[in-house]
Amino acid sequence: MDNVIEMPSGHSGALMWVADPGDAHVNGSVDQEADRAYRKLPGIAPPTGGHVFRILQLAPGKSAFMHRTDTIDYAIVQQGACVMKLDGDEEVAMNAGDVMVQRGTWHGWENRGDEPCRLAFILISSEAPEKHLHMED
């Protein structure tokens, strides 16, 4: 692939598809100009109201970069193993074939193994989560 980006963290990634709001149709062709413009933007979230599909390869031994996006995310571990770190001390171990759906949580991905871990992500733009996701009575 010619669109792989090496990140300062040592990880690498590739943007496979991006769509603006209302672009969920199969007729026509990809707007190459809009696609090139999006690839130059910083950040990982899709355009507001849109969606994005990307591949991420986690390098071994790198710490998690904690972040949150206003998205619903589908993550599929394609190769290797990793840990998804959440707020506090919570962690979820994931292996090849595992699928995770998350909704606007603070999280980070960490590869504690000796081999790269490859994940596929689909991020769908969403409203920001409420400040307090866990309400007490």
Task: Go through each PLM region and give its residues.
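A short, N-terminal "cap"/entry segment at the start of jelly-roll beta-barrel domains
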Residues: 1-52, 56, 137
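A short hydrophobic beta-strand segment most commonly corresponding to one strand
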Residues: 73-74, 99-105, 114-131
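Conserved short histidine dyad/triad with adjacent acidic residue
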Residues: 32-42, 51-70, 103-106, 125-127
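Short beta-strand His + acidic residue motifs that chelate non-heme Fe in jelly-roll/DSBH
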Residues: 64-66, 84-85, 107-113
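Glycine- and acidic-residue-biased ligand/ion/polar-headgroup-sensing regions
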Residues: 70-87
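Short acidic-glycine-tyrosine-enriched beta hairpin
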Residues: 88-104
